[in-house]
UniProtKB/Swiss-Prot annotation:
It catalyses: alpha-D-glucose 6-phosphate = beta-D-fructose 6-phosphate. Pfam families: PGI. This is Glucose-6-phosphate isomerase, cytosolic 1A. It is found in: Cytoplasm. It comes from Clarkia lewisii.
Length: 569
């Protein structure tokens, strides 16, 4: 008998649907009172502790989710990914970001070829180059050392490396290695982003890393040309060869741009942009800032989770458990969003990165076979570090919409502070909130409890907390390069699990194409209006035509053929 075309047609899915009503009638106060249940919902791997006991789920729910995973052939799909099968069917590609952090002696194949030697050839090249820049043997056009790096990219070429960079900035080992150096990221085509990036920098001491697989990405290449002009106008056109390098596979365009092809660092079609932080996309700028040895520890951390994900049984597999629980929350309980709440300021860029990884991967409306999905998939990801978020959007999380939360805590602070006379130290104060918030969400506060506290009758409705709001807690022992790599890989694989169960392609992103193609028409119109004085053509709808006309009229002072003007800040 053939497998159902959609996961929602399986008996396992229908069984969970039938199970749902009983769970909805059971409050987390009751579920949390079952110690045996709570113990069964705690998992540890390599000193990473996951507690999912505050999920609206019973042991029976979890058992049924394992059956759903079996019905979705989850294990086989994970194996196919690791085996290099073309699981990205719409682009006919392997999905092998796990190969980017595999040990040198590993064998991971795509189209019958072991790709690990190619990965390590690039890593070795990055190590040699970053060492030469850091030790001063590679110098700029005027003989000065290159202490500042601007990485130019967008999307996955920006968000992932920025997350890791921000997390490493306050790690003692990494910050020591980065002393006297600066790493910045230029992503937005808005000239303000250019101005902010070059502010205070000297072209003589700046190295630019241009990240574009095809070397045709519109925003990235415009920003790259802008920085090329910034360098050339200060140091002369020949300086580009010493002050700009590329992460790309299109060597002819790299050379045409003015960058020596020998200073181009490759990555491959089997690396998706949002999964590329462990490739030259992230490893090159991060190695220039922190040294290759630190970045190698980051890769080793990611690899440890890759091994765990591929080999651990589902009941002890952290990414699998997190992925299945997300499917439960989204497709069955109907919660459309997820809050990522790291109680570590060093992780302030985690949520924006996972927002892309998750929403670009699983923001799909059809199955991998092109069938419309009759259920909700994907979720809206957002977040902010604690305790800042508590003074921002936690009001809604506690008393408004139900939003499942990921609480991420770190046992040992990167930068501990102890003040004499304080009741607790700064990190203990932070962690007091980390431990309290999940219980506040789960238990809430009843009108009866408020009456016992002699709260005024008219305030009781306003001070009541319904509770029964699900969360998970992840406790990391430290936050160093290794643990940052582990955290990244946990979320990457969690997203893949969700897509595998929903039966969608988590590794393409056709949704970004339509807006880009329409922008081409607008770009052509702006050029025609600026240079030739052409009116806005009839090809636009009334609204867009009105907005475009208004914009052009208000910027009529923009010269048709301007001389070069760079930001002055």
């Amino acid at each position: 008998m053939a497998s159902p075309a959609l996961i929602s047609e399986t008996e396992a899915w229908k069984d969970l649907k039938a199970h749902l009503e009983g769970i909805k009638m059971t409050h987390l106060r009751e579920l949390m009172g079952d110690t045996e249940r709570c113990q069964s919902m705690m998992v540890e791997f390599d000193n990473i502790f996951l507690d999912y006991s505050r999920q609206q789920a019973s042991p029976d729910t979890i058992s049924k989710l394992y059956k759903l995973a079996d019905a979705a052939h989850l294990k086989q799909k994970i194996d196919r990914m690791y085996n290099g099968d073309h699981i990205n069917t719409t682009e006919n590609r392997s999905v092998l970001h796990v190969a980017l952090r595999a040990p040198r002696n590993s064998a991971i194949c795509s189209d019958g070829k072991n790709v690990v030697p190619d990965v390590w050839n690039v890593l070795d090249k990055i190590k040699d180059f970053s060492d030469s820049v850091r030790n001063g043997s590679w110098i700029g056009a005027t003989g000065k050392e290159l202490k500042d790096v601007i990485a130019v990219g967008i999307g996955g070429s920006f968000l992932g490396p920025l997350f890791v960079h921000t997390a490493l900035q306050t790690d003692p080992e990494a910050s020591k290695n980065a002393r006297g150096r600066e790493l910045r990221f230029l992503a937005n085509v808005d000239p303000i982003d250019v101005a902010r990036n070059i502010s205070g920098l000297n072209p003589e001491t700046t190295l630019v890393v241009v990240v574009s697989k095809t070397f045709t990405t519109a925003e990235t290449m415009l920003n790259a040309r802008t920085l090329r002009e910034w360098i050339s106008s200060a140091l002369g056109p020949s300086a580009v060869a010493k002050h700009m390098v590329a992460v790309s596979t299109n060597l002819p365009l790299v050379e045409k741009f003015g960058i020596d092809p020998n200073n181009a660092f490759a990555f491959w079609d089997w690396v998706g942009g949002r999964y590329s932080v462990c490739s030259a996309v992230g490893v090159l700028p991060l190695s220039l800032q922190y040294g290759f040895a630190v970045v190698e520890k980051f890769l080793q951390g990611a690899h440890s989770i890759d091994q765990h994900f591929s080999s651990a049984p589902f009941e002890k597999n952290i990414p699998v458990l997190l992925g299945l629980l997300s499917v439960w929350n989204v497709s069955f309980l109907g919660y459309p969003a997820r809050a990522i709440l790291p109680y570590s300021q060093a992780l302030e860029k985690l949520a924006p990165h996972i927002q892309q990884v998750s929403m670009e991967s699983n923001g799909k409306g059809v199955s991998i076979d092109g069938l419309p999905l009759p259920f909700e998939s994907g979720e809206i990801d957002f977040g902010e570090p604690g305790t800042n978020g508590q003074h921002s959007f936690y009001q809604l999380i506690h008393q408004g919409r139900v939003i499942p939360c990921d609480f991420i805590g770190v046992v040992k602070s990167q930068q501990p502070v102890y003040l004499k006379g304080e009741v607790v130290n700064n990190h203990d104060e932070l962690m007091s909130n980390f431990f309290a918030q999940p219980d506040a969400l789960a238990y809430g506060k009843t009108p009866e409890e408020l009456k016992k506290e002699n709260v005024s009758e008219h305030l009781i409705p306003h001070k009541t907390f319904t509770g029964n709001r699900p969360s998970i807690s992840i406790l990391l022992p430290t936050l160093d390069a290794y643990r940052i790599g582990q955290l990244l890989a946990i979320y990457e694989h969690r997203v893949a699990v969700q897509g595998f169960v929903w039966g969608i392609n988590s590794f393409d992103q056709w949704g970004v194409e339509l807006g880009k193609s329409l922008a081409t028409q607008v770009r052509k119109q702006l050029h025609g209006s600026r240079v030739k004085g052409e009116p806005v053509e009839e090809g636009f709808n009334f609204s867009t035509k009105t907005l475009l006309t208004r914009y052009l009229q208000a910027t009529s002072d923009v010269p048709a053929d301007p001389s070069t003007l760079l930001p002055n800040i």
